[in-house]
Amino acid sequence: MTALTESSTSKFLNIKEKGLSDFKIHYNEAGNGETVIMLHGGGPGAGGWSNYYRNIGPFVEAGYRVILKDSPGFNKSDAVVMDEQRGLVNARAVKGLMDALGIDRAHLVGNSMGGATALNFAIEYPDRIGKLILMGPGGLGPSMFAPMPLEGIKLLFKLYAEPSYENLKQMIQVFLYDQSLITEELLQGRWEAIQRQPEHLKNFLISAQKAPLSTWDVTARLGEIKAKTFITWGRDDRFVPLDHGLKLLWNIDDARLHVFSKCGHWAQWEHADEFNRLAIDFLRQA
């Protein structure tokens, strides 16, 4: 297979959904077969490619059409201030993208904020989802054991409010378990993404005031999710508490949970090979 690059897979389209009128969405696309849409997290400078460049190739080789979507207000997608909880608005953006591309049904893979987006989508559009793969998703309210917000979320908001290379480095150090994976290339790439779109950072903070994290909680509606669900978590996640994985397991009818040891908040990146194998096996099962 020809090596996939960000530029060779980069595309744009416009969607029209509530809160996103004539809105430009950026995405990366490759492969053929059943559609898998991968949804990134909510840290400053995040985007589809930076979140999933270690996953897109193996999924394409496994026979899937893969779409890495930049959520509204992130990376190359249009800027936006949201009056409603972000997971719900992001779910509408996923629906809008699917409508524009003529996709009736898709599997969703979501990390952190992307997981919250996937949960909202599964609740609001149950006939449009295939299977659901979640990695440390947000949107699940308080923890049974840990005071909220966790350390990583505090550093995330600090970086939004005071963008600097040092604050970025502090957040990434909490993000990953294996500190040897933190390279200047990783930090510089994320820092450049932050600097390219300062408007995204300001709008995120304004949106967080209008619809704070407490409004994201969809726990009461998890029982509505009928999609087969594969939940993964990093044992050492310092952004979203591990007991939220149990909350999902208890409330979603057809769910299973895998916990990665020596893993932070970015399972699909930090343990890419194992994650890819487990996730693809899950999608292939009847």
UniProtKB/Swiss-Prot annotation:
Site entry: Transition state stabilizer: S112
Gene Ontology CC: membrane
Annotated InterPro entries: AB_hydrolase_1, AB_hydrolase_fold, AB_hydrolase_sf, Epox_hydrolase-like, HOPD_hydrolase_BphD
A GO biological-process term: acylglycerol catabolic process
Origin superkingdom: Bacteria
Ligand binding (substrate): G42, G43, N51, N111, S180, R190, W266
EC number: 3.7.1.8
Gene3D superfamilies, per the entry: alpha/beta hydrolase (3.40.50.1820)
Signal peptide from the UniProt entry: none
Subunit structure: Homodimer.
HAMAP family hit by this protein: Biphenyl_BphD
Family: Belongs to the AB hydrolase superfamily. BphD family.
Function: Catalyzes an unusual C-C bond hydrolysis of 2-hydroxy-6-oxo-6-phenylhexa-2,4-dienoic acid (HOPDA) to produce benzoic acid and 2-hydroxy-2,4-pentadienoic acid (HPD).
Protein's recorded name: 2-hydroxy-6-oxo-6-phenylhexa-2,4-dienoate hydrolase
